[in-house]
Amino acid sequence: MGIVTSRFNAGSLRQIKLCLIAAPMNAVDFASLLCSRLCHDLMSPVGALNNGIELLADETDPEMREKCLELLADSARATANKLKFFRLAFGAGGGFADEIDTGEAQAALEGLFGGEGKVQLGWVVSDEKLPKGAIKLLLNLSLLAGDALVRGGQLDVGAERRTGEIELAVRAEGPRILLDPVLRQTLATGGSGTIEPRAAAAWLAHHLAGEAGGTIKLSDPTSDVLMIGAVIPA
C-alpha cells in the first residue's frame, strides 16, 4: 500500500472497477457539455464585472467608486483564476510536453478555491513533474471533491509516483459534504443516458482514468469524509 493511500485512510475506500460500457459520447457532445459547464461557472464573476462597471459609470462619490474598483478587481481575479484552472484541467494547458510541473497544478487549485477562503487546501505532492493525464485527472477529482464541500472545509490533494504506477488521492472534510449521486455514478461508471453539464468533470475523470488503464476509488456515501482516488500506470 502506497504512502499516499495510507495517508488518506485508504482502509475506508472501496475500489470501483471502471465500467467502459457507458453511453457513448462523441467529441461534439462533450465539447457542448464542457462549454455549458464553463459558461455556468464563469457567469457569476463575469456578471459581477458587468455590475461593477455599471455602478462605476453612475457613481460620483469617491468612497463608493473605490468600493466599485475593489469589486471589479475581485471579480477579475476570480475570473482569471477560474480560466487558469479550466485551461489546465480541461484544455491544453501545460503545452505539448508529456509532463507538467506540479507547482502549476497547485497554483491552479489555490486560485480556484483560495479566493473566498472557505476551502483550505493541503498539497501532498512531492514530485516536481507528473504526466499530463495524471495532472488532469487529479485536478478534476479535486474539483469534484472541492465542490462537495458546500460549507467549506479541508481539501487534501496527494499524488505519488511509484514503480510502474501513479497513485492519486483527494480527501474532503467539512461540516457538510454533498457529492450528488449523479456525479458519483458518472465518476464511477461514466454515467448513462444524457450527461448533464455539471457532470462534465466526473465524466472526464472517469474516461481519463479508463483510457490510462487505471481504476477509481470512492469512499462510501455514508462516510463523514469524502475520499476519491485513482491508480493509473506510470
Each model region followed by its residue ranges:
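Conserved signal-transmission helix
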Residues: I16-F30
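Conserved short strand/loop->alpha-helix "switch" segment adjacent to the catalytic nucleotide/phosphoryl-transfer site
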Residues: N26-L33, K118-G146, V150, G191-T194
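Conserved ATP-binding N-box helix of the HATPase_c
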Residues: S32-N51, E59, G133-A159, W203-L208
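Short acidic helix/loop segment immediately C-terminal to the autophosphorylated histidine
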Residues: A57-E63
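Conserved DHp (HisKA) dimerization/phosphotransfer helix of two-component histidine kinases, i.e.
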Residues: R65-V119
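Short beta-strand/loop element within the Bergerat-fold HATPase_c
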Residues: D156-L168
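Glycine-rich/acidic phosphate-handling loop/turn and adjacent ATP-lid/helix
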Residues: I166-A199
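Glycine-rich ATP-binding loops of the HATPase_c
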Residues: G213-D220
